[in-house]
Amino acid sequence: MSIDLSRIPAQPKPGVVNVLVEIAGGSRNKYEFDKEMKVFALDRVLYSAVVYPYDYGFIPNTLADDGDPLDGLVMMDEPTFPGCVIPARPIGMLEMIDSGDRDEKILCVPVDDPRYAEVKSLKDIAPHRLEEIAEFFRTYKNLQKKVTEILGWQDVDAVQPLVEKCIKAYKG
């Protein structure tokens, strides 16, 4: 199965992004989309005894400062699968440094899940849940001897300008 990223809009409508899942929540397997083969390939298995807290992937047709598409993490009660496109509402972002590069993780909720209908910003998420997410990204590369640094959370107002910037950067 080949995936044509050009057919997946980054932002199908205002306030919504498409997140293409690379890694299902609860998994240690780190898949990445191979642009040449247009399929998902196993990049590595996490070295640590941790799992991705939620479905993790990227917003197609964006280009972030680290040279990759903008990362997205979608809070869901059930994991999906690599290759699933989730229309998602951004609610904030985790700013971090990964291997010396700035790296933002856009935290989203699924548009089509009524359990998250009232979740509009980070203020609607328990602070402990946000700490769990930050802790995952703070420590998931420790046994690889790679350094990540958490800079902090930014609320929903900071997300749209970044998404627009990354769409523009992708278009060149």
Swiss-Prot record:
Record localization: Cytoplasm
Amino-acid positions noted as binding substrate in the UniProt annotation, renumbered to this chain: 30, 44, 56, 140
UniProt GO molecular function: inorganic diphosphate phosphatase activity; magnesium ion binding
Keywords: Cytoplasm, Hydrolase, Magnesium, Metal-binding
Keyword Cytoplasm among record annotations: yes
Binding-site residues for Mg(2+) 2, renumbered to this chain: 71
Names of the cofactor(s): Mg(2+)
Top-level taxonomic group: Bacteria
GO cellular component: cytoplasm
Enzyme Commission numbers on file: 3.6.1.1
Pfam families given in the database record: Pyrophosphatase
Main subcellular localisation: cytoplasm
Residues annotated for Mg(2+) 1 binding in this entry: 66, 71, 103
Gene Ontology BP, a term: phosphate-containing compound metabolic process
The reaction(s) this protein catalyses: diphosphate + H2O = 2 phosphate + H(+)
EC category: hydrolase
Physiological role: Catalyzes the hydrolysis of inorganic pyrophosphate (PPi) forming two phosphate ions.
Record-stated family: Belongs to the PPase family.
Oligomeric form and interacting partners: Homohexamer.
Name recorded for this polypeptide: Inorganic pyrophosphatase
Name of encoding gene: ppa
